[in-house]
A protein has these predicted regions:
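Secretory targeting and sorting signals
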Residues: 1-27
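Post-signal peptide N-terminal regions of Sec-secreted extracellular proteins
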Residues: 27-138
């Protein structure tokens, strides 16, 4: 009877350890990707304009962030050139709206080896403008 009770306690403890360990290791595998800032600019004034640019290796996704104080309308555009193996391709587009604004940029192909990115934005009035680029990487 005592051996059965010890076995039940041992199995219960082992189950509790596995219940904590397995989700933790699965969680670590899911969170290996991280977001990094690859370019930034800040400026103040009437119709303030600034350009953020940068390079990134193995991006999963790239975003442009536009913030202003006070919040207001803005317009801008972005472009990128990415390489993969022996080839290269580009993509570009516009970004506009009301700050704060975050826009995911369309990469020219999936899983590029590297990308060079630039984004420019201009305020429609007076204020402080902050434009920055982020990338999700492995």
């Amino acid at each position: 009877m005592i051996k059965v009770a010890k076995a039940v306690v041992l199995i219960t403890c082992l189950g509790a350890i596995l219940a904590v360990t397995v989700p933790a290791s699965a969680s670590q595998a899911m969170h290996r990707n991280r977001t990094i800032r690859i370019g930034s600019c800040q400026i103040s004034g009437r119709f303030a304009t600034c350009e953020a640019s940068g390079s990134v290796n193995n991006p999963i996704r790239i975003k442009v962030h536009v913030k202003a104080v006070p919040n207001q309308r803005f317009s801008g555009n972005w472009s990128m050139v990415c390489s993969k193996r022996n080839g290269a391709a580009s993509s570009s587009g516009t970004v506009s709206g009301l700050t704060p604004r975050v826009k995911e940029l369309r990469m020219p192909f999936a899983s590029p080896d590297s990308c060079d990115v630039a984004a420019i934005a201009s305020l429609n009035g007076r204020g402080s403008l902050h434009v920055y680029l982020t990338a999700r990487v492995p």
